[in-house]
């Protein structure tokens, strides 16, 4: 499965994109995003460390394997629907 994110916020704050993680063994892929995801990836002291950050640039589309561990690089921003983080997300299957 592939995932796509299109950033749709004009002039977003710096460091408001997407971060991909890898673990101590160099693995980028996880076992899905079940309840263990937050505990194993996002909590401090985790074996999963930030590996790559993609900046949030208006109208940029990023494509990645859907099983890569990822999260926003910072907390969501804005205090209303008009000023918050806006993205279009999609998923698709393709054989390469």
Language-model segments: which ranges?
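Catalytic core of non-heme Fe(II) oxygenases with the double-stranded beta-helix
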Residues: 1-96
């Amino acid at each position: 499965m592939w995932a796509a994110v299109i950033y749709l916020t004009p002039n977003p704050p710096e460091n408001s994109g997407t971060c991909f993680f890898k673990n101590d063994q160099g693995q980028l892929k996880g076992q899905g995003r079940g309840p263990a995801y937050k505990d194993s990836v996002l909590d401090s002291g985790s074996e999963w460390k930030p590996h790559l950050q993609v900046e949030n640039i208006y109208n940029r589309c990023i494509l990645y394997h859907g099983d890569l561990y990822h999260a926003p690089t910072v907390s969501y921003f804005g205090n209303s629907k008009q000023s918050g983080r806006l993205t279009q997300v999609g998923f698709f299957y393709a054989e390469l």
